[in-house]
Swiss-Prot record:
<dbReference type="GO" id="GO:0140078">
    <property type="term" value="F:class I DNA-(apurinic or apyrimidinic site) endonuclease activity"/>
</dbReference>
<dbReference type="GO" id="GO:0008270">
    <property type="term" value="F:zinc ion binding"/>
</dbReference>
<comment type="function">
    <text>Involved in base excision repair of DNA damaged by oxidation or by mutagenic agents. Acts as a DNA glycosylase that recognizes and removes damaged bases. Has a preference for oxidized purines, such as 7,8-dihydro-8-oxoguanine (8-oxoG). Has AP (apurinic/apyrimidinic) lyase activity and introduces nicks in the DNA strand. Cleaves the DNA backbone by beta-delta elimination to generate a single-strand break at the site of the removed base with both 3'- and 5'-phosphates.</text>
</comment>
<keyword id="KW-0456">Lyase</keyword>
<dbReference type="InterPro" id="IPR012319">
    <property type="entry name" value="FPG_cat"/>
</dbReference>
<dbReference type="InterPro" id="IPR010663">
    <property type="entry name" value="Znf_FPG/IleRS"/>
</dbReference>
<keyword id="KW-0862">Zinc</keyword>
<keyword id="KW-0326">Glycosidase</keyword>
<feature type="binding site">
    <location>
        <position position="91"/>
    </location>
    <ligand>
        <name>DNA</name>
    </ligand>
</feature>
<keyword id="KW-0227">DNA damage</keyword>
<dbReference type="InterPro" id="IPR020629">
    <property type="entry name" value="Formamido-pyr_DNA_Glyclase"/>
</dbReference>
<dbReference type="Pfam" id="PF01149">
    <property type="entry name" value="Fapy_DNA_glyco"/>
</dbReference>
<keyword id="KW-0378">Hydrolase</keyword>
<protein>
    <recommendedName>
        <fullName>Formamidopyrimidine-DNA glycosylase</fullName>
        <ecNumber>3.2.2.23</ecNumber>
        <ecNumber>4.2.99.18</ecNumber>
    </recommendedName>
</protein>
<dbReference type="InterPro" id="IPR035937">
    <property type="entry name" value="MutM-like_N-ter"/>
</dbReference>
<comment type="subunit">
    <text>Monomer.</text>
</comment>
<keyword id="KW-0863">Zinc-finger</keyword>
Length: 275
């Protein structure tokens, strides 16, 4: 699943490719992907000009002026731009024809991606309803707020970080990396974390997601950016996908286990489980 660094990389690519372009026609092959009114989606988008491409957590925000097209890539979603003819592909589901003759295509093998066309004035309410946490930046991701939320919850720390309420943008790859860097076992109850662990989790979340953006995201499975290029963050992953390899910190073999139904990579020596 694309996580914050991958979505930010896609955002940057899309802004390069389609900024200022007018949408002249839209073809939708999988109606269930649109979560707002279908008729409004089909009739309103033609004539709209793409003014910017933003991001909030794992959501892409295609700014159309008074409206925003909110796109979530879910497991396998990606965007491709074709300058003229679009090849046949059963996984191409949404086609945005642009005035310059090119077509922006949304591809999704799993068909889990979503689109919401909403008024820009409703954007804050849209994310408030989903209880989306702050962006992982020092200016917005406040340590005291993070600490208070953790200490009031019995939820295991990995599922808690994944639910997007504490901080926006973490997924399975980067949560494993953050927990390893902070030396925290993923099954530790949030309320049992001490102040030093909480600070490490906070600081490593900011650092690791920023590094992921710098490296263009992690190309594992099928991720590519909007320009069709791989990311390089996979070369910097310390524990995710490293089962059986030595921990970069202590040399103990990395193990894989299930936490909250998710495959999870840890160093059993550095991330000891509390009794």
């Amino acid at each position: 699943m694309p996580e914050l660094p991958e979505v930010e990389t896609v955002r940057r690519g899309l802004e390069t490719l389609v900024l200022g372009q007018e949408i002249v026609a839209v073809t939708l092959k999988v109606p269930k992907m649109v979560k707002t009114d279908l008729e409004t989606f089909a009739l309103t988008l033609p004539g709209q000009i793409i003014q910017s491409v933003g991001r909030r957590g794992k959501y892409l925000l295609i700014d159309l002026g008074q409206l925003v097209l909110v796109s979530h890539l879910r497991m396998e979603g990606k965007y491709l731009l074709f300058p003229d003819e679009v090849p046949d592909n059963k996984h191409f589901h949404v086609f945005f024809e642009l005035k310059n003759g090119s077509t922006l295509v949304y591809q999704d093998v799993r068909k889990f991606g979503t689109f919401d066309l909403i008024a820009k004035s409703q954007l804050s309410a849209f994310f408030a309803k989903r209880k989306l946490g702050p962006e992982p930046k020092k200016e917005t991701f406040k340590l005291k707020t993070f600490e208070a939320a953790l200490l009031s919850s019995q939820k295991p720390i990995k599922p808690h970080l994944l639910d997007q309420t504490l901080v926006a943008g973490l997924g399975n790859i980067y949560v494993d990396e953050v927990l390893w860097a902070a030396k925290v076992h993923p099954e530790t109850a949030s309320s049992r974390l001490n102040k030093a662990e909480i600070k490490r989790l906070h600081d490593e979340t900011i650092r690791i997601l920023a590094l992921g953006i710098e490296k263009g995201g992690s190309t594992v499975r099928t991720y590519r950016n909007a320009l069709g290029a791989d990311g390089t963050m996979q070369d910097y992953l310390q524990v995710y996908g490293q089962t059986g390899k030595p921990c970069p910190r202590c040399g103990q073999a990395i193990v894989k286990l299930k936490v909250g139904g998710r495959g999870t990579h840890i160093c059993p020596k550095c991330q000891k489980k509390r009794p």
